[in-house]
């Protein structure tokens, strides 16, 4: 009998590598994980709310974090549907320069004002800056984040703990470098397809209409350019006001789950709709092309 295996973790150190390249001891490990969660969650909400990414055609794909001594360098991977440019030419584009400027304004200035207003909160949280206190708050926040991830109550009910961690980002020199890399239309990634599902379902499209568009896109990539060898998409949830949950799937081509050398990309996402929450799983088998940027990103 076969077992269900995550295709990314099964192929680590053979084809794929970790997305966040850093290591630390047992004291600061849980604290640094929470920093990565806050940065990743900020970028996802920043593109959807402030930039109107559904109308502009920008989709957040992935974020890569590399740490050095008291510095962080961020690599933000963005898919732009209107532009078909290479990653080294995106510095000339004004759209991607706005993301850097708005990041410095929203992320730093917004939370500094909140900390200045809550002086009593600062005295209660920042009187003791020992390692034991930091670890106690970080473990509690990490547990509550996993518990309430689907309901999206994190930013509303746990403001005291979020302000405690955002104080650590108060120095502008802490985030030394921010690189914004745009993926063109030739690049294929499972995260792009899951975000495309999220945009279409919020715009009241049916599932079969979305699956037809994706099937038409993959067939053009498989026949002409041979960038994709196969794919599989599964959806489960209450769609179109049905009382029971439905399970729908679509597959085409070949998918080799057991072989280690096959380049597989996987994504799992939960979407909160009006009636219920639905789940989406995407498997994509990539072709043999050296210039594909997705091969270097988990």
UniProtKB/Swiss-Prot annotation:
Give the GO molecular function terms: RNA binding; structural constituent of ribosome
Superkingdom of source: Eukaryota
What the entry lists under Pfam families is as follows: Ribosomal_S3_C
Localization, UniProt: Mitochondrion
Q: Which GO terms describe its biological process?
A: translation
Is Membrane set as a keyword in this record?
no
Q: Does the keyword section mention Ribonucleoprotein?
A: yes
UniProt keyword annotations, A-Z:
Mitochondrion, Ribonucleoprotein, Ribosomal protein
Q: Which GO terms describe its cellular component?
A: mitochondrion; ribonucleoprotein complex; ribosome
Protein family (similarity comment)? Belongs to the universal ribosomal protein uS3 family.
Q: What is this protein called?
A: Small ribosomal subunit protein uS3m
Organism field: Acanthamoeba castellanii
Source species taxonomy: Eukaryota, Amoebozoa, Discosea, Longamoebia, Centramoebida
């Amino acid at each position: 009998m076969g077992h269900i295996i995550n295709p990314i973790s099964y192929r680590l150190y053979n084809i794929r590598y970790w997305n966040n390249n850093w290591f630390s001891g047992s004291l600061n490990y849980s604290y640094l994980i929470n920093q990565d969660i806050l940065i990743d969650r900020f970028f996802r909400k920043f593109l959807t709310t402030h930039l109107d990414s559904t109308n502009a055609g920008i989709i957040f794909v992935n974020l890569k974090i590399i740490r050095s001594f008291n510095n962080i360098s961020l690599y933000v991977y963005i898919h732009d549907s209107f532009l078909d440019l290479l990653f080294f030419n995106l510095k000339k584009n004004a759209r991607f320069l706005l993301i850097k400027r708005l990041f410095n304004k929203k992320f730093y200035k917004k939370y500094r004002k909140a900390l200045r207003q809550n002086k009593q909160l600062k005295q209660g949280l920042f009187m003791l800056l020992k390692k034991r206190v930091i670890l106690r708050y970080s473990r509690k926040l990490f547990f509550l984040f996993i518990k309430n991830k689907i309901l999206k109550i994190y930013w509303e009910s746990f403001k005291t703990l979020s302000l405690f961690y955002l104080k650590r980002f108060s120095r502008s020199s802490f985030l030394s470098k921010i690189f914004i890399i745009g993926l063109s239309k030739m690049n294929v990634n499972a995260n792009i397809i899951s975000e495309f599902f999220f945009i279409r379902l919020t715009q009241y499209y049916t599932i079969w209409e979305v699956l037809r568009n994706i099937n038409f896109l993959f067939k053009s990539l498989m026949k002409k350019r041979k960038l994709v060898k196969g794919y599989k998409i599964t959806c489960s949830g209450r769609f179109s006001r049905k009382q029971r949950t439905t399970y729908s799937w679509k597959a085409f081509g070949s998918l080799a789950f057991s072989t280690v050398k096959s380049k597989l990309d996987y994504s799992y996402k939960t979407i909160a709709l009006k009636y219920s929450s639905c789940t989406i799983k995407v498997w994509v088998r990539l072709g043999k092309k050296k210039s594909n940027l997705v091969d270097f990103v988990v």
